[in-house]
């Protein structure tokens, strides 16, 4: 059963009680009668990024890691959802409540948690804090879980260029921030290295401090339609929940979409469009969350930069669509590019 702890601007004490009462797998009434042994169980928590659980992408990948830890490690999990338009102070309050409730580790899903984690980690030095997609804030009890997104995106560019009939492809970024620029840079380089004459249409949905580009599917849908109208027949979106709108528009037009973060061909919420999801650039967010939880449980908590790239299968390109697996020339080109990146023959740019 899905149990989400929602913390917005409630007081710290009441928030902590709410978290304790809604740990994954327990109703509030069950939690109220917890035994002493329950209170000593290892607990772990994740605080979701914009879009929350159900985004069919980034947040859901993190949740899958927590689920795996619950099943394989016997960990008691807790979750906390973001609120629209929240401040860093709201994030501090959420993370504080999670730490005060005894969760260890506490994981912030997304770079937006960096300032809050830096502050709360100092207040709870015995708790390990994980942050995904950020290295700007460090500390002895902070694990920076990061990925070479540009490498996976390069492979997507190769696949897009090899698949396109119009020699025009599209990239849609949710919000124009350095992280998403990495996706763009790798994708464009992969396209151009494969087909120098190809045209890459690039659009960002919003600019900071407006982060709706990660959460509004209608924005992604409109952007994709604009690129389709300009002749794009393969569109890659790095836009969280907003990317689902781009996938919908692309699929309805009978063109190819490329997903991100999770294998979006396999996501139930996108089942109606999966035949047009050529592939997805995957990040092993699930594995990074699970590994951090396991390290804490084993008494050897990770800290510092924990980077995952093509060489460690931390990023990659999904091959779930049977139509894609039949494209032997595309797969051969992707595999060659992967080998060349791992061997150091290709250096992928991190900025456009």
What are these regions, as identified by a protein language model?
Residues 1-14:
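N-terminal export and membrane-targeting signals
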Residues 3-6, 24-26, 32-352:
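A residue-level marker of the well-folded mature domains of exported/periplasmic proteins
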Residues 12, 18, 31-37:
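Intrinsically disordered, low-complexity segments
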Residues 19-23:
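C-terminal motif of bacterial Sec signal peptides marking the signal peptidase cleavage site
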């Amino acid at each position: 059963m899905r149990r989400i702890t929602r913390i917005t601007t409630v007081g710290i004490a009441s928030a902590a009680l709410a978290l304790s009462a809604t740990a994954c797998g327990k109703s509030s009434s069950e939690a109220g009668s917890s035994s002493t042994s329950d209170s000593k169980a290892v607990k772990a928590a994740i605080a979701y990024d914009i879009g929350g659980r159900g985004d069919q992408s980034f947040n859901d990948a993190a949740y899958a890691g927590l689920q795996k830890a619950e099943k394989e490690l016997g960990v008691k999990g807790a979750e906390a959802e973001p609120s629209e338009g929240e401040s860093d102070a709201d994030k501090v309050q959420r993370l504080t409540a999670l730490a005060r409730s005894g969760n260890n580790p506490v994981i912030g899903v997304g770079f937006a948690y960096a300032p809050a984690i830096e502050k709360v980690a100092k207040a709870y030095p015995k708790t390990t804090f994980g942050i995904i997609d950020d290295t700007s804030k460090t500390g002895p009890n902070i694990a920076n879980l990061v990925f070479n997104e540009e490498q996976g995106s390069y492979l997507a560019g190769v696949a897009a260029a090899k698949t396109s009939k119009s020699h025009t492809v599209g990239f849609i970024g949710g919000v124009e921030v350095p992280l998403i620029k990495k996706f763009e840079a790798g994708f464009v380089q992969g396209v151009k290295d494969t087909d120098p004459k190809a045209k890459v249409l690039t659009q960002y949905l919003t600019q900071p401090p407006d982060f709706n580009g990660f959460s509004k599917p209608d924005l992604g849908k409109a952007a994709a339609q604009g690129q389709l109208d300009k002749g794009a027949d393969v569109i890659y979106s790095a836009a969280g929940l907003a990317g689902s709108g781009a996938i919908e528009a692309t699929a309805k037009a009978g063109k190819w979409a490329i997903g991100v973060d999770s294998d979006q061909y396999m996501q139930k919420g996108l089942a109606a469009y999966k035949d047009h999801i050529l592939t997805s650039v995957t990040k092993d967010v699930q594995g990074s969350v699970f590994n951090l939880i396991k390290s804490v449980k084993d008494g050897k908590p990770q800290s510092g930069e924990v980077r995952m790239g093509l060489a460690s299968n931390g990023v990659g390109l999904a091959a779930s669509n049977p139509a894609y697996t039949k494209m032997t020339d595309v797969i051969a080109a992707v595999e060659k590019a992967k080998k060349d990146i791992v061997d150091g023959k290709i250096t992928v740019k991190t900025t456009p």
